[in-house]
């Protein structure tokens, strides 16, 4: 598969993004959110690792998170989807205002894909670490059916509001969650509990653990490719 590069988009009011296309006139899209301190280029190379030749052309959209001070890092300003005030992942300790603010920005990117001819039903919302947290939060509360949610090395935030905020359109959306068993940043068991909670709410979650740390390994990428191929083939 040869993926075409397109420049970062400067659309007024939208997050800047890096884009890759697997062909002309994309019919599907994957909006992929990076982790804390990274940027939209972080996962750009994985496009060349995937083999989607049997699928219609896909547009990969890698947004850059806003710059903000991160409390747990001494107030250092970096790209972050929300502030992290402590390493305590107890329910209710997330910086909910920042999560919601980022979710609103991702909603705007979803709307732009709609305007470019790709309906929500052909869009996968994906993310790693902080990006996965925002992908889960946004996708489960999105009012129109998505093709899927891909959440790597992360956890489900704001569980206390999910029952009242979850949208019926995505109650059966395919979800792939994966986590490194030696993750020292976001505990493996936290990710596993998040998947278990979603399964208890009857979301169709595929959960995978891997012998890696806070990163994505080759075996995981192969499983992600298989899952994406399946959900996008069903959607497109």
Q: What residue spans do the PLM features occupy?
A:
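Serine-hydrolase catalytic machinery in alpha/beta-hydrolase-like enzymes
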Residues: 4-121
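Short alpha-helix in the alpha/beta-hydrolase fold that links the catalytic acid
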Residues: 43-48, 163, 187-197
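Alpha/beta-hydrolase-fold catalytic nucleophile elbow
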Residues: 63-64, 126, 150-153, 178, ...
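Short beta-strand/loop motif that positions the catalytic acidic residue
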Residues: 176-179, 183
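C-terminal catalytic histidine-bearing segment of alpha/beta-hydrolase fold enzymes
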Residues: 189-236
């Amino acid at each position: 598969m040869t993926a075409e590069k397109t420049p970062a988009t400067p659309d007024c009011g939208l997050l800047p993004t890096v884009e890759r296309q697997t062909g002309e006139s994309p019919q599907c899209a994957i909006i992929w959110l990076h982790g804390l301190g990274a940027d939209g280029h972080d996962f750009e190379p994985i496009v060349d690792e995937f083999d989607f030749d049997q699928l219609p052309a896909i547009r990969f959209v890698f947004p850059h998170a806003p710059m903000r001070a991160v409390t747990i890092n001494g107030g250092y300003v970096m790209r972050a989807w929300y502030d992290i005030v402590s390493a305590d992942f107890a329910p209710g300790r997330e910086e909910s205002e920042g999560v919601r603010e980022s979710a609103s920005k991702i909603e705007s990117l979803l709307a732009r894909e709609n305007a470019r001819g790709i309906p929500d039903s052909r869009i996968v919302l994906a993310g790693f670490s902080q990006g996965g947290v925002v992908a889960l939060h946004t996708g489960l509360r999105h009012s129109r059916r998505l093709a899927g949610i891909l959440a790597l090395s992360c956890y489900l935030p704001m569980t206390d509001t999910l029952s009242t905020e979850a949208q019926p359109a995505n109650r059966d959306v395919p979800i792939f969650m994966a986590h490194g068993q030696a993750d020292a940043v976001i505990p493996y068991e936290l990710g596993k509990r998040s998947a278990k909670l979603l399964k208890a709410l009857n979301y169709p979650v595929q959960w995978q653990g891997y012998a890696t740390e806070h990163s994505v390994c080759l075996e995981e990428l192969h499983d992600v490719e298989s899952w994406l191929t399946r959900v996008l083939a069903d959607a497109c």
